[in-house]
């Protein structure tokens, strides 16, 4: 098995978008209503993901030539970490997080992220602490629940 962590390139945009969308579409319905899943789509458009790649914010984990994990960062903020469902529970999420944290902790004393309900325990097990519970009104009497979490270097 060949595993490579690297900065995403513009050629990776479609696959990174697929990793995010496919994972969200498979996992989120077990935790969120259809309205919430559709609301999240606004923040995960192809254009946004492509822009983050062009700005050097996005990383990918490539296994045997296939992008299986993606994650982005801006300064000390980690965002959009997704592992294809068929690769979850095999350490690939931990691998990309290790690398993102290494980059961040080289320049910052802490890192932050917003954790979806399915990811909260994963981040807690990595040493993240919840600093705020968020209940975001998405309209029509619906809300989205997530955590803002922080990990301190050390």
Feature names for model-found ranges:
Residues 87, 91-99:
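Conserved acetyl-CoA pyrophosphate-binding loop and the N-cap/start of the following alpha-helix
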Residues 109, 113-121, 126, 133-154:
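C-terminal "cap" of GNAT-fold acetyltransferases
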Residues 1-14, 153-154:
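Conserved N-terminal entry element of GNAT/NAT acetyltransferase domains
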Residues 21-47:
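Conserved GNAT-fold acetyl-CoA-binding loop/helix
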Residues 16, 49:
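Hydrophobic pocket/interface hotspot
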Residues 56-69:
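Conserved beta-hairpin
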Residues 74-86:
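Conserved acetyl-CoA binding element of GNAT-fold acetyltransferases
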């Amino acid at each position: 098995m060949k595993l490579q962590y690297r900065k995403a390139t513009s050629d990776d945009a479609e696959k990174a978008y697929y990793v995010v969308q496919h994972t969200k579409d498979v996992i989120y319905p077990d935790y969120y209503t259809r309205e919430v899943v559709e609301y999240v789509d606004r923040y995960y458009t192809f254009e946004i993901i492509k822009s983050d790649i062009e700005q050097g914010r996005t990383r990918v984990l490539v296994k045997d030539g296939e992008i299986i994990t993606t994650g982005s960062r801006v300064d000390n903020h980690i965002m959009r970490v997704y592992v294809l469902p068929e690769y979850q529970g095999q350490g690939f999420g931990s691998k990309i997080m290790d690398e993102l944290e290494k980059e961040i902790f080289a320049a910052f004393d802490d890192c932050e992220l917003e954790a979806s309900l399915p990811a909260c325990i994963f981040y807690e097990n990595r040493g993240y602490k919840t600093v705020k519970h968020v209940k975001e009104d998405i309209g029509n009497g619906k809300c989205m629940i997530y955590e803002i979490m922080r990990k301190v270097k050390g």
